[in-house]
């Protein structure tokens, strides 16, 4: 089984600076994934490999809005669902005893809905277009995550770490917060760019 769930939210402006996006980057965090994991050993591609069922209707629309497949043109993304399928087989497989495909994606949407990280950052005067210390970003997010979040950076331009993703962790049944293990991708001594 697994010890915690990490909801990973991507900042699209940074993602689309580092990757080629077919979708217009929304000005808010979008879901990258919901990752069941253990503190010591990383879990992925668990057996048995689940079968992915394609979403339609309301669930498709909700995912398209809140878990945007930024790299893919919208019609292709909605039909082929490459990002969701990949995430489900890689990560959803590791909590399939507890969550089936519908409950897994439903849970990710429900957990994302608990937080407005952009508003939280803005409340703490952390605004897209400027740079901030790692600690300032960490402390702002911790006001809503209660336990330690995992702030993830990417250094697309050498010497300029930028805020890329934020992980918020939960207990396996998602009823309380869990202290995220730290991925240590941010230079704690440098200013971190919050890309506009």
UniProtKB/Swiss-Prot annotation:
GO biological process: RNA catabolic process
Reactions it catalyzes: a ribonucleotidyl-ribonucleotide-RNA + H2O = a 3'-end 3'-phospho-ribonucleotide-RNA + a 5'-end dephospho-ribonucleoside-RNA + H(+)
Keywords, comma-separated and alphabetical: Disulfide bond, Endonuclease, Glycoprotein, Hydrolase, Lyase, Nuclease, Secreted, Signal
Superkingdom classification of source: Eukaryota
Residues annotated as catalytic: 32 (proton donor), 87, 91 (proton acceptor)
GO molecular function, one term: RNA binding
Keyword Nucleus: no
Protein's cellular compartments: Secreted, Extracellular space
Keyword Lyase belongs to the record: yes
Pfam families (UniProt xref): Ribonuclease_T2
PROSITE patterns, per the entry: RNASE_T2_1 (PS00530)
Subunit structure: Monomer.
Record-given protein name: Ribonuclease S-F11
Organism for this UniProt entry: Nicotiana alata
């Amino acid at each position: 089984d697994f010890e915690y769930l990490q909801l990973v939210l991507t900042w699209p402006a940074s993602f689309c600076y580092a990757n080629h996006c077919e979708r217009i980057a929304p000005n808010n965090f979008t879901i990258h994934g919901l990752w069941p994991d253990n503190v010591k050993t990383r879990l992925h591609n668990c057996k048995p490999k689940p079968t992915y069922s394609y979403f339609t209707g309301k669930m498709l629309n909700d995912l398209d809005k809140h878990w945007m497949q930024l790299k893919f043109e919208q019609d292709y993304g909605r039909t082929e669902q490459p990002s969701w399928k990949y995430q489900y087989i890689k990560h959803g497989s590791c909590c399939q005893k507890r969550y089936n495909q519908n409950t897994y994606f439903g849970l990710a949407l429900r957990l994302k809905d608990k937080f407005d990280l952009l508003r939280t950052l803005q409340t703490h005067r952390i605004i897209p277009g400027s740079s901030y210390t790692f600690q300032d970003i960490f402390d702002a997010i911790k006001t809503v995550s209660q336990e330690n979040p995992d702030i993830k950076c990417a250094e697309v331009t050498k010497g300029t770490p930028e805020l890329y993703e934020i992980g918020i962790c939960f207990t396996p049944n998602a009823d309380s917060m869990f202290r995220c293990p730290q991925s240590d991708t941010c230079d704690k001594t440098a200013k971190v760019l919050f890309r506009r």
